[in-house]
Amino acid sequence: MEGESTTAVLSGFVLGALAFQHLNTDSDTEGFLLGEVKGEAKNSITDSQMDDVEVIYTIDIQKYISCYQLFSFYNSSGEVNEQALKKILSNVKKDVVGWYKLRRHSDQIMTFRERLLHRNLQQHLSSQELVFLLLTPSIITESCSTHRLEHALYKPQKGLFHRIPLVVANLGMSEQLGYKTTSGSCTSAGFSRAVKTHSSEFFKEDGSLKEVQKINEMYTSLQDELKSICEKVEHSERAVEKLLNDVNRLKGEIKKRKQAQMQATREKNVQKDPQENILLCQALRTFFPDCELLHSCVISLKNRRISGSSCTTTHPLSGVDNLTLMVEYTDFPEASPARSALLVTKRKASDTDDGWQFKKSRLGGIQNRPSKTDTNSSNQEQASTVSSPETDEEIERMKGSGEYPQSPTF
């Protein structure tokens, strides 16, 4: 399957020059377009193994030649004047790709005369690919401050004129970023003279470049130098990476050491901070409330003096009324908890027996002592009763149970 498509490319400065020339004249203008036509065939193979060939023709409009008056190479019926046409296109006849016309305040439609003239030009120029560019400027504001320029490109196909797409190439278009496959056909005379003058220094008679072999040798040596530099850069990057790893490792070790030092300093500060003996302070304030000497200093658990001022803090202790001597079993490292419990039980029992014998002898002495008067005997009995904290029943009960009354001891 084969298909054809035609597109035209017009540079921005050529279109700007056409518009500038037309706006600086008082009448319509016309002329010829110069450039080249390129054809490319694209072959696309589908999954069904069918070849799809598409031929794309690109009309590259590069320059223009203007005629300074109308009907300069044709008459009113559209017939071409060969002498006038040869005079206008003396040396660029093979570069003509079409012609143009600028009409003021008209529609984008080809007239009958323009159609006849286009067919006659195809015959005289022996080119069936001629195109016609129609430019129609108009004023869109009453103050004539804004103008509009419309353009359209026509090409005859099967006896009818069809519009073909025209692309105005600007600087910001992505299509112009690629390289051109062929050079422009419309070169200036100055460029040709400059190339002809210096071509003998760079080109041979057959058109090939001189010193191509030396240039290739220089290219090879540059490639070798580039490879060696790349190897050096790779080694240096490896060394830098190793150094960075070492630096990161050392930073981590330094951080760990600093954290360990801070932790040790924090623990040392906590150990140096003395702890107040709250139990001793509360006991002294409870049993000796009027003795300022005992309140004048605060003693820590390790027998260290904290401050010289008296302690006025009320410690929230629930058992301050039942304060007693606290014996720590850690003072006797050779004694086990079971043995210590046994010793405490025996000590309580012996203390109870001793107390019972002492109180019994005490009561016997009072009874055997001769009384002077009845009053004295009653007083002695009352005193003995008051002095003994327990009655006989309580003594018997305590003796049987093995307990003793708790009292504050210092």
Curated annotation (Swiss-Prot):
PROSITE patterns, sorted: MPN
Modified residues annotated as Phosphothreonine in this record: T391
Maturation and modification: Phosphorylation of Ser-407 of the pSXXF motif by ATM or ATR constitutes a specific recognition motif for the BRCT domain of BRCA1.
Primary localisation category: nucleus
Keywords per UniProt: Chromatin regulator, Coiled coil, DNA damage, DNA repair, Nucleus, Phosphoprotein
Biased composition (Polar residues): 368-389
Top-level taxon: Eukaryota
Gene Ontology molecular function terms on file: microtubule binding; polyubiquitin modification-dependent protein binding
Places the protein is found: Nucleus
Pfam families: MPN_2A_DUB_like (PF21125)
CDD domains: Abraxas_1
Motif (pSXXF motif): 407-410
Positions of modified residues (Phosphoserine): S48, S387, S388, S407
Domain called MPN: residue spans: 7-160
Coiled coil regions in record: 208-261
Stretches the record annotates as Disordered: 354-410
One GO CC annotation: BRCA1-A complex
Biological process, per Gene Ontology: attachment of spindle microtubules to kinetochore; chromatin organization; double-strand break repair; mitotic G2 DNA damage checkpoint signaling; mitotic spindle assembly; positive regulation of DNA repair; response to ionizing radiation
InterPro entries in the record: BRISC_Abraxas1, FAM175, MPN
PANTHER family in UniProt: ABRAXAS FAMILY MEMBER, BRCA1-A COMPLEX SUBUNIT ABRAXAS 1
Homology family: Belongs to the FAM175 family. Abraxas subfamily.
Known function: Involved in DNA damage response and double-strand break (DSB) repair. Component of the BRCA1-A complex, acting as a central scaffold protein that assembles the various components of the complex and mediates the recruitment of BRCA1. The BRCA1-A complex specifically recognizes 'Lys-63'-linked ubiquitinated histones H2A and H2AX at DNA lesion sites, leading to target the BRCA1-BARD1 heterodimer to sites of DNA damage at DSBs. This complex also possesses deubiquitinase activity that specifically removes 'Lys-63'-linked ubiquitin on histones H2A and H2AX.
Name the record gives this protein: BRCA1-A complex subunit Abraxas 1
Gene expressing this chain: ABRAXAS1
